[in-house]
């Protein structure tokens, strides 16, 4: 569907790798059996692309944690790439299972086994949540029946914002490594909540220009978070804000200080200047200005607690385990993953 779609021409045909079967929502299949057969051909493609870079910054991977392929094979791929390029940044955009909308029964298993890997092997993980995306579509964009296309539109805005400084000139540049250095106070705490402002639906990019205060206000708003966690229930360890468009740096700095002063109780006091700002001159298409928000908040634990509770409920009864042990997994792995999370 990618090849026949409008973007089929963007990718080189020999850079497509696909297998004959899916992992059937089974993490073990993606990580140990089916995925392991494919992973070498994927690594060949990665190697070929990496060799043609003059200065490789790192890798970005988009996957879901609820299924089998994205979670199982995705984490396998991460650990393999990590082996081969240990000093390069590893970034993931991970779609975490949402609290109310569940696609598969075994989501908690797959997600827990994946987080177990992500904690060790990635430098920054952006937690994206379908439910939070649906909420943004309903509440803010007033869409009655959001499609995956609408959800993807939101995610792509964030992804574009995170990498914008690598791709365009700006007054205050940040790249993936600078982000990681500024955002991760302790190596395991690299799970971020993304946000974006101004929120627009796909067809109707807004016609009115926003001001810097409005952008700042909007991007710190809990309703703008793309993970189903409420930042007001926790505190920010660090925050990164990436502004795009022509704007006064002075105003940006003032607004960012303003937010920290007004809401100082939501920022930990033991990291004094914990907001990193980057400004890039070129705005996204159709907007005059935009801002991407990346928060490393303690509230992200809500998400892990939720998955963990569901995991425990099923694991206590050993429900569905035979699908995993049948692919050669051990119950110990489950116990380890649970305690690591």
Swiss-Prot record:
GTP binds at residues 64, 68-70, 130, 152. Its cofactor is Mg(2+). The keyword Protein biosynthesis does not apply. GO terms for cellular component: cytoplasm; microtubule. Tubulin is the major constituent of microtubules, a cylinder consisting of laterally associated linear protofilaments composed of alpha- and beta-tubulin heterodimers. Microtubules grow by the addition of GTP-tubulin dimers to the microtubule end, where a stabilizing cap forms. Below the cap, tubulin dimers are in GDP-bound state, owing to GTPase activity of alpha-tubulin. Belongs to the tubulin family. This is Tubulin beta chain. It comes from Haliotis discus.
């Amino acid at each position: 569907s990618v090849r026949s779609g409008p973007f089929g021409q963007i990718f080189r045909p020999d850079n497509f790798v696909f297998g004959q079967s899916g992992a059937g929502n089974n993490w073990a299949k993606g990580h140990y059996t089916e995925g392991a057969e494919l992973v070498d051909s994927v690594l060949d493609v990665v190697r070929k692309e990496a060799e043609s870079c003059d200065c490789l910054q790192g890798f970005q991977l988009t996957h879901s944690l609820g299924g089998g392929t994205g979670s199982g094979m995705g984490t396998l791929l991460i650990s393999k790439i990590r082996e081969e390029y240990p000093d390069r940044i590893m970034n993931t955009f991970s779609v975490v299972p949402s609290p109310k909308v569940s696609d598969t029964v075994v989501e908690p298993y797959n997600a827990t086994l994946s987080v177990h890997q992500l904690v060790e092997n990635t430098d920054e993980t952006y937690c994206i949540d379908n439910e939070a995306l649906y909420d943004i579509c309903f509440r803010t964009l007033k869409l009655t029946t959001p499609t995956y296309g609408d959800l993807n539109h939101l995610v792509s805005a964030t992804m574009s914002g995170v990498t914008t400084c690598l791709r365009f000139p700006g007054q205050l540049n940040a790249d993936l490594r600078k982000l990681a250095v500024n955002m991760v106070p302790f190596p395991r705490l690299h799970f971020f909540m993304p946000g974006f402002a101004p929120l627009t639906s796909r067809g109707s990019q807004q016609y009115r220009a926003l001001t810097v205060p409005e952008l700042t206000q909007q991007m710190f708003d809990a309703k703008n978070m793309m993970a189903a966690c409420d930042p007001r229930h926790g505190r920010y360890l660090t925050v990164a804000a990436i502004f795009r468009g022509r704007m006064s740096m002075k105003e940006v700095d003032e607004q960012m200080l303003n937010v920290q002063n007004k809401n100082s109780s939501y920022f930990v006091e033991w990291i004094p200047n914990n907001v990193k700002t980057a400004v890039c001159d070129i705005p996204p298409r159709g907007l005059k200005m935009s801002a991407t928000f990346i928060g490393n908040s303690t509230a992200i634990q809500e998400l892990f607690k939720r998955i963990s509770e569901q995991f425990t409920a099923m694991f206590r009864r050993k429900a569905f385990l035979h699908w995993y042990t049948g692919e050669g997994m051990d119950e110990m792995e489950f116990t380890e993953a649970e305690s690591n999370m």
